C-alpha cells in the first residue's frame, strides 16, 4: 500500500489529533479494511457513527456553553469568518477543548472529523426546525461527504 497517501489522507481528516489517528488505524486494522482510500473512508464513517468518550465530552461542552455552540454553528453552517482571538471567551473555550484552530488569522474547525461530527450533532438537535432543512440543502457546500 501507499503509506504516504494513506498517512496524508488520515492527516487530512484528523489534523493529527492523536485519538482520531489511533482510532482510525485501529478500526482499519481490526476491521480488516484495506489500507487505501476506501479503507480510510470506511474507518472514518465507522468512527463518526460510534459512541466514544471524545464525542461524549464534545457533546457535553457544546451543551454547557450555548454561546460556544452558536459560534461553531456560524462557522459550520454559515461559513462565517471568525477572527482568531484568544481573548474572545467562546473562542478561548473552543481552543481549550481543541474544537478550533487558527489558520492565517481565521478560526477553523480543528479537523474534518470534528466538523462533520459537530454538523451531525447540530442537525440532529435541530431536525424539527428550519435550520435543519436549510442545513440539508447547504450540506454539500460545507461538509465533505464520505463514501458509504
Task: Label each region the model flagged.
Residues 106-111:
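Minor-groove-contacting beta-hairpin "wing" of winged helix-turn-helix DNA-binding domains
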Residues 114-144:
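Short, amphipathic alpha-helical interaction segments positioned at domain boundaries
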Amino acid at each position: 500500500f501507499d503509506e504516504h497517501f494513506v498517512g496524508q489522507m488520515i492527516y487530512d481528516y484528523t489534523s493529527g489529533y492523536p485519538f482520531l489517528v489511533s482510532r482510525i488505524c485501529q478500526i482499519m486494522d481490526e476491521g480488516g479494511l484495506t489500507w487505501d482510500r476506501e479503507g480510510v473512508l470506511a474507518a472514518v464513517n465507522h468512527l463518526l457513527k460510534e459512541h466514544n468518550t471524545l464525542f461524549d465530552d464534545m457533546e457535553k461542552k457544546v451543551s454547557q456553553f450555548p454561546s460556544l455552540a452558536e459560534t461553531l454553528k456560524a462557522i459550520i453552517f454559515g461559513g462565517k469568518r471568525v477572527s482568531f482571538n484568544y481573548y474572545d471567551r467562546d473562542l478561548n473555550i473552543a481552543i481549550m477543548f481543541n474544537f478550533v484552530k487558527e489558520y492565517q488569522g481565521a478560526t477553523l474547525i480543528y479537523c474534518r472529523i470534528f466538523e462533520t461530527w459537530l454538523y451531525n450533532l447540530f442537525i440532529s438537535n435541530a431536525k424539527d426546525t428550519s435550520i435543519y432543512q436549510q442545513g440539508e440543502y447547504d450540506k454539500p457546500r460545507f461538509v465533505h461527504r464520505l463514501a458509504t
